[in-house]
C-alpha cells in the first residue's frame, strides 16, 4: 500500500506540476499578449502625437493663409475699383470715338461737296 500511495503521490505531484506548467504557460502567453498590446498602444500614441503635430502645423498654416487673404482682400477691392474706372474710361472713349467718326464724316462730306465759298477777306458765304 505504501507503494500505491507513493505512486499516487507521485502521480498527483506530476499532475500538479503539469497543471502548474500549463497555468504558467498560459500566464506567460497572456503576459506576452499584454506586452504586445502595450507596444502597440505606445506606437499608436506616437502616431497620434505626430498627427497632432501635423494638425497644429496645418492650423498655423491656415491662420497664416487667412491673414494673407485679408491683405489680399484690400488689393482685390483696389482691383475692382480700377476695373470699374477702366470700364468708365472705355465708355467715354467709345463716345469720343463715335463723335470723332461723326466729325470725320462731316469733314469728308464738306471736302467732297463744299457748300461754302470763301471771299477774299476769308469770311464764309453760304450758297
UniProtKB/Swiss-Prot annotation:
GO terms for cellular component: BLOC-1 complex; endosome. Component of the biogenesis of lysosome-related organelles complex-1 (BLOC-1), a complex that mediates the vacuolar degradative transport via the intracellular vesicle trafficking from the endosome to the vacuole. This is Biogenesis of lysosome-related organelles complex 1 subunit 2. PANTHER family: BIOGENESIS OF LYSOSOME-RELATED ORGANELLES COMPLEX 1 SUBUNIT 2 (PTHR47882:SF1). Disulfide bonds: none annotated. Keywords: Cytoplasm, Endosome. It is found in: Cytoplasm; Endosome. Component of the biogenesis of lysosome-related organelles complex-1 (BLOC-1). Interacts with BLOS1 and SNX1. It holds the Pfam family BLOC1_2. Belongs to the BLOC1S2 family. Its main location: cytoplasm.
Amino acid at each position: 500500500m505504501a507503494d500505491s500511495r507513493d505512486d499516487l503521490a507521485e502521480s498527483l505531484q506530476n499532475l500538479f506540476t503539469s497543471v502548474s506548467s500549463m497555468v504558467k504557460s498560459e500566464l506567460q502567453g497572456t503576459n506576452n499578449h499584454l506586452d504586445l498590446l502595450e507596444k502597440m498602444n505606445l506606437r499608436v500614441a506616437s502616431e497620434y502625437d505626430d498627427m497632432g503635430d501635423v494638425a497644429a502645423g496645418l492650423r498655423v498654416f491656415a491662420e497664416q493663409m487667412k491673414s494673407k487673404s485679408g491683405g489680399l482682400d484690400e488689393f482685390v477691392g483696389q482691383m475692382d475699383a480700377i476695373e470699374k474706372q477702366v470700364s468708365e474710361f472705355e465708355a467715354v472713349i467709345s463716345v469720343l470715338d463715335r463723335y470723332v467718326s461723326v466729325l470725320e464724316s462731316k469733314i469728308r462730306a464738306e471736302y467732297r461737296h463744299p457748300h461754302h465759298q470763301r471771299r477774299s477777306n476769308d469770311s464764309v458765304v453760304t450758297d
